[in-house]
Amino acid sequence: MESFENKGFLDIEEGIQWIKKNSENLSSSKKTILARLQQFHKLCSEVGLNQHSISSLLDVILSKKTHFDKNHVQLLIKCLYPNELISQTIAIRIISSLDPHGLRCSYAIQAKLLNWLIHVYEFLDGNNLLCRYYGVLFHFLDFLTLRPYISNLLVLLTKHYHVKSFRIHQLLALYQKPGNTADPYLLALILTYKQHFPDVIVGSYTYRKHGSVRLDSEWIAATKAILNRQSEDVPLETWSSEKRKRQSSLIPDLITMKNTSSSYSLEELTSVQQMGLVYEKIVFPSRIAAVLKSKLFLIFLFLKNKNVYYSRLDEWLHITLNYGLALRSGSNNQEEEVLHLLYKYLLFSPKFPKSLLQYVITFFSKPNITEENYNLLTLLVTHIPITTDSSYFNSLLKEFEQFILQKNAEFCSKHLNILWLWLFRMLNLRIASMGNNHTLLEKCLLITNHATFLVSHFSWDVSLAYQLSRLFQLYYKILTKIRKQIEPNIPPKELIYVLFFQPSAFYINSMVGLLLLTKNYQERLMDSRIDAISKFTHSYLKSLSEIILLKEKRAILSFLQLWEPFKSDYSQFLPIATRIANDHPYAQRVFSLTCAPQFFSYINGYQIYLQQTNPATGSIPLKPIQEETFGAFQSNLHLSDSWEDFQKNFIIYLKKKGYLAISDFLLSTLNR
């Protein structure tokens, strides 16, 4: 008989029939029964049980007449692997079986069933019906054997409307009883309640021991594998996302804790008058935080612009950021929710919360920082007031550096975009709101130095160098706007060579734009004694003269853009102009149809400029556009057969293309 039984069960139904039969009348020894149950457990771990099978096994587990001993029943509970979403009625049945006296079901079995319920909580088909039994579960908190499991279930189920005044009083009274002061399970529930009403549950509570039940990861993994096989169209990530969706929110709902006939909850408002009355009665910081969920209330808050509201909001933020977000391991999603809310708040808010300043620094000490939360935090940082102490700015940028140095160039590129946005916000500040100009310039200097350090760390990557040039362009625009005569931060020489030696005009033009801004800043201040800028611009011109003959027409165009603002620096331009103009094979190779006339028009204009300023100055030994270069242009344009017709048609062509200044200059030359 035993050799036949050792072959195992053909299917789940056969196993359940055998279990029911032997629970009423044992047909074998306990050792044989245990071996058969282990075979059944192995089968269940492979195929799982449907709701009907789970319900049938619960009949055996909860039966007072069963002949199975405690070990057999506990093994049966481990067999409850679901292969589909579990109905809430099964969970309600387990809660209904709880017996404070342990007569219907022993405390050990009740604890095992509650533990199973925690393990399958994310596989329930909902929790709306289960929430109706919240009070029943809360009643069993006083039972030491069941408390770890009851507390965990309550933490999972708790919503804002569950946190009532009487429950807060009962929970705190239970925690203060002798022997319960260090209870981690009660503390976990207290901290959950504190998230919803930090203004009611005051004081600090810290863990000595983590107050959660240890989950059997292998059992959960086996369950997920079964569910995945049973339902190919539902990926495993569905279960984890469902779990995250049920995670309690740190942001209170739009309700008041107590409502009377003369007051309204924020959800019940129907008129502006009612909204005004409710605002006047807002007392608790958590209610201020709840207001942030509604754009209408948020705008109303800014219109009221009362300091008492901002101070209460800051108080809620202090508790939420320093206590709520550190409550459990899954707090990254809660943190993302809070940071999203704060980002929307700061888009309109005239005031930056003080508690957020400290949290920004402590954020980087977290062991697991998600990229989404990091991006949100950096966006918040761009709203930090410029009146904030410079030492804080310096500390913040140091934290950024340590964090980014562990990443790659792509991550650094995203960070430089944030720095650009930060400087752009500073540029768009009204002059009156800029406060102390020296403070603003000090912040800009810190940001540009920080960006330069990061780009140099990543070996002057081309894309990063381009972003750095954009940062310096904003920096010089800010300097020009506030008209503050200072010795500015000069871009490093490495930036010159990295961008000028690129084959793309995109990078060269960014460098030219920066060079023009530095010159403009010098001219706006009307102070040529700023040696730093003079040295800076001359170093660029020297670099340009070194590489321009190695380039094609892109470098020539850059040269021409710089001609007019820097024509007084003839010592830098004269060698380049002479070389380009007299090297016709080179000119034919690099000149475009618009570049060549533009270049020669500037050369002629420069000669006129020299004659006017210093008549003793000789002319540049220059060969003008003549028939020698006509062949190269004619092959491109196919406009005329004669040099005279070519000149006329070429002027018409330039006008069509919008080069009016060049065409007018050439036309005046022809007329002469």
From Swiss-Prot:
> Subcellular localization, per the record?
Nucleus; Chromosome, Centromere
* Cited InterPro entries: CENP-I (IPR012485)
Q: Which GO terms describe its biological process?
A: cell division; CENP-A containing chromatin assembly; mitotic sister chromatid segregation
List the GO terms this entry assigns under cellular component, sorted alphabetically.
chromosome, centromeric core domain; chromosome, centromeric region; condensed chromosome, centromeric region; inner kinetochore; kinetochore; Mis6-Sim4 complex; nucleus
Q: Which UniProt keywords apply?
A: Cell cycle, Cell division, Centromere, Chromosome, Mitosis, Nucleus
The similarity annotation says:
Belongs to the CENP-I/CTF3 family.
Give the function comment from the record. Component of the kinetochore, a multiprotein complex that assembles on centromeric DNA and attaches chromosomes to spindle microtubules, mediating chromosome segregation and sister chromatid segregation during meiosis and mitosis. Component of the inner kinetochore constitutive centromere-associated network (CCAN), which serves as a structural platform for outer kinetochore assembly. Required for the localization of cnp1 to the centromere.
On assembly, the entry states:
Component of the inner kinetochore constitutive centromere-associated network (CCAN) (also known as central kinetochore Sim4 complex in fission yeast), which is composed of at least cnl2, cnp3, cnp20, fta1, fta2, fta3, fta4, fta6, fta7, mal2, mhf1, mhf2, mis6, mis15, mis17, sim4 and wip1. Interacts with cnp1, sim4, mis15 and mis17.
- Supply the name of the protein: Inner kinetochore subunit mis6
Q: Which organism is it from?
A: Schizosaccharomyces pombe (strain 972 / ATCC 24843) (Fission yeast)
Q: What is the lineage of its organism?
A: Eukaryota, Fungi, Dikarya, Ascomycota, Taphrinomycotina
